[in-house]
């Protein structure tokens, strides 16, 4: 571990359309090969589809979906005396948000709809209603932590 001071967190500018910083972070994670305009068009297209389908504020639906996917607890490997234990630990808020964003994008990419905007909107609507693969991933993570609760005293 470095003894130098911790680098300061990079400030992420809010997205131009809704002025939402989390949405901007989501776009940055969705972006491939530095093509931000493509990522923006996908996200904005998905939000438009969500608005027509759900008849509700798409940014609020996005935040609901993100909160439903956000994990509270996860397991981390810890080696103790030649054995590796899966130790449940609480997830820091920044990491929980990053994991939720990553899981939503992965789940959307694995869907079968034709366009990425359609896949993303379907996954976000599912997540907002506590369904879908991203929510399943969170449930699996919580289940793993619950199953390994006996090793929680190995926390560091």
Swiss-Prot record:
GO terms for molecular function: rRNA binding; structural constituent of ribosome; tRNA binding. It comes from the Bacteria. Signal peptide: none annotated. Keywords: Ribonucleoprotein, Ribosomal protein, RNA-binding, rRNA-binding, tRNA-binding. One of its GO terms (biological process) is translation. The keyword Chloroplast does not apply. GO terms for cellular component: small ribosomal subunit. Part of the 30S ribosomal subunit. Contacts proteins S9 and S11. PANTHER family: RIBOSOMAL PROTEIN S7. Belongs to the universal ribosomal protein uS7 family. One of the primary rRNA binding proteins, it binds directly to 16S rRNA where it nucleates assembly of the head domain of the 30S subunit. Is located at the subunit interface close to the decoding center, probably blocks exit of the E-site tRNA. This is Small ribosomal subunit protein uS7. It comes from Novosphingobium aromaticivorans (strain ATCC 700278 / DSM 12444 / CCUG 56034 / CIP 105152 / NBRC 16084 / F199).
């Amino acid at each position: 571990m470095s003894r130098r001071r911790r680098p300061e967190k990079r400030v992420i500018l809010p997205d131009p359309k809704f002025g939402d910083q989390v949405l901007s972070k989501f776009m940055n994670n969705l972006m491939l090969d530095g093509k931000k305009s493509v990522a923006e068009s996908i996200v904005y297209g998905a939000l438009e589809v969500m608005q027509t389908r759900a008849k509700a504020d798409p940014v609020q639906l996005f935040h609901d979906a993100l909160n439903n996917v956000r994990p509270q607890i996860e397991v981390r490997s810890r080696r103790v005396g030649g054995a590796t234990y899966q130790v449940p630990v609480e997830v820091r808020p920044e990491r929980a948000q990053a994991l939720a964003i990553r899981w939503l994008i992965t789940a959307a990419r694995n869907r079968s709809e034709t366009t990425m905007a359609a896949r993303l909107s379907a996954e976000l609507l599912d997540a907002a209603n506590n369904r879908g693969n991203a929510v399943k991933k969170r449930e699996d993570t919580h289940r793993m932590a619950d199953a390994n609760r006996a090793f929680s005293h190995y926390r560091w």
